[in-house]
Curated annotation (Swiss-Prot):
Keywords, sorted A to Z: Antimicrobial, Disulfide bond, Fungicide, Plant defense
UniProt similarity note: Belongs to the DEFL family.
Protein name per Swiss-Prot or TrEMBL: Defensin-like protein 1
CDD domains assigned to the protein according to its UniProt record, in alphabetical order: Knot1
GO biological process: defense response; defense response to fungus; killing of cells of another organism
Origin species: Triticum aestivum
Site (Interaction with trypsin): K11
Keyword Disulfide bond part of the UniProt annotation: yes
Disulfide feature: C3-C47, C14-C34, C20-C41, C24-C43
Superkingdom classification of source: Eukaryota
Record function comment: Inhibits protein translation in cell-free systems.
SUPFAM superfamilies cross-referenced by the UniProt entry: Scorpion toxin-like
Presence of keyword Disulfide bond: yes
Length: 47
């Protein structure tokens, strides 16, 4: 199963999946990507 959550530390619109993934990894998640019409950074990991 994959868990997803909005990044707590990512600021502004998400334009780069790479930047989002780096922020998520610093928060202890496996990675992340830009998602949805508002381009939020969503963190993902196995759970």
């Amino acid at each position: 199963k994959i868990c997803r959550r909005r990044s707590a530390g990512f600021k502004g619109p998400c334009m780069s999946n790479k930047n989002c993934a780096q922020v998520c990894q610093q928060e202890g998640w496996g990675g992340g990507n830009c998602d949805g019409p508002f381009r939020r950074c969503k963190c993902i990991r196995q759970c």
